[in-house]
Regions:
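Structured C-terminal cap/extension of enzyme domains
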Residues: 26, 201-309
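Alpha-helical structural signal in soluble globular domains
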Residues: 41, 65, 69-73, 98, ...
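Active-site-adjacent beta-strand anchor residues
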Residues: 82-85, 140, 170, 193-194, ...
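Catalytic alpha/beta core domains of metabolic enzymes, predominantly
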Residues: 131-132, 145-249
Length: 309
């Protein structure tokens, strides 16, 4: 493990979008602008190839390019976490080894997501995976996509391996997340991270270490400031910033009637901000001009002066 990653990992760790020019063409210049934008905004680490990064819609070639270019651009300035979730344990290990070769600091794994797994099978899966990994591992709970929740006792069992250093929860279930925090209370070096940005501040107030929040792609300073307000229990500032986060959630992520609205809105906003392309991997499509106008209006209402292009 590189010395630059503090344990437990804390703060705002944006799940990077994967900037695309076509289904199998990485927008490398856009990725450069995005990473510099995030570093300038004070984020604490980078997380690539997660759900926001459209990993499961990308070819292995493109995933490899994303890993290589992210590590090259970051240049060790902050930790890089790489998601290796896959239906094939062999491919997960291959991605982990490539991530290590290019200087990443940790890997992240959700359960294999095609066949539904039980808790004993989850334990066996990670007992098989962990000895093959060259980097520390974060467990990733995404039950809407994987059809299974990590039971708190399962996390305890898997985390008996010292190579498991944290947990990212995207269930949006605060009772569940608190149950996991309670189960892991005797392991202070185990990083507890929450995915939904709407829940980040309250989670940090109650002891979580930070958030893996998609909106930080657009406004890293906002999410870092909200994290700091929660960390310092500055309730007045927290309420003010939380309102901004909820405004983003209620406007930029809700254009359209489909589950892809979050991703399309986020990428459209990044395009309007001049950061990267708004191309979305198949089977989805980027917003048409009418929806783009709604995102432009949402940015204007947030006080961001951008030109509608």
């Amino acid at each position: 493990m590189n010395n630059k990653m503090n344990i437990p990992l804390s703060g705002i760790i944006p799940p990077l979008v994967t900037p695309l020019l076509d289904d199998d063409v990485l927008d490398v210049e856009g990725l450069q602008r995005l990473i510099e934008h995030l570093i300038a905004g004070g984020v604490h680490a980078l997380f690539v190839l997660g759900t926001t990064g459209e990993s499961q819609s990308l070819s292995y070639k493109l995933r490899v390019e994303m890993i290589k270019n992210t590590c090259r651009i970051a240049k060790g300035r902050l930790p890089v976490l790489v998601c290796i979730s896959d239906t094939s344990i062999v491919e997960s290990v291959n991605l982990a080894c490539l991530a290590a070769d290019h200087g990443a600091d940790a890997v992240v794994s959700a359960p294999p997501y095609y066949f539904a797994t039980g808790q004993p099978e989850l334990i066996e899966f990670y007992e098989h995976l962990l000895p093959q990994l060259p980097l520390p591992l974060f467990l990733y709970n995404m039950p809407t996509h994987t059809k299974v929740n990590f039971a708190p006792a399962t996390i305890q069992r898997i985390a008996e391996n010292p190579g498991v250093i944290g947990f990212k929860d995207s269930s949006a279930n605060t009772v569940y997340f608190q149950s996991v925090m309670y189960a892991m209370k005797d392991n202070p070096d185990f990083s507890m991270l929450v995915g939904p940005e709407e829940l980040m501040a309250e989670s940090v107030l109650l002891g979580a270490h930070g958030g893996v929040n998609g909106g930080a792609n657009m406004f890293p300073e906002l999410y870092v400031s909200l994290y700091n307000a929660a960390k310092n229990a500055d309730m007045e500032e927290l309420r003010r910033l939380q309102e901004k986060v909820m405004q983003i959630s209620a406007t930029i992520y809700t254009v359209g009637q489909h589950g892809s609205s979050y991703l399309k809105g986020l990428k459209c906003a990044l395009s309007l901000l001049g950061i990267c392309s708004d191309y979305v991997a198949a089977p989805f499509h980027k917003f048409e001009q009418r929806e783009r106008g709604k995102i432009w209006k949402a940015l204007q209402n947030l006080g961001v002066d951008v030109v509608l292009r």
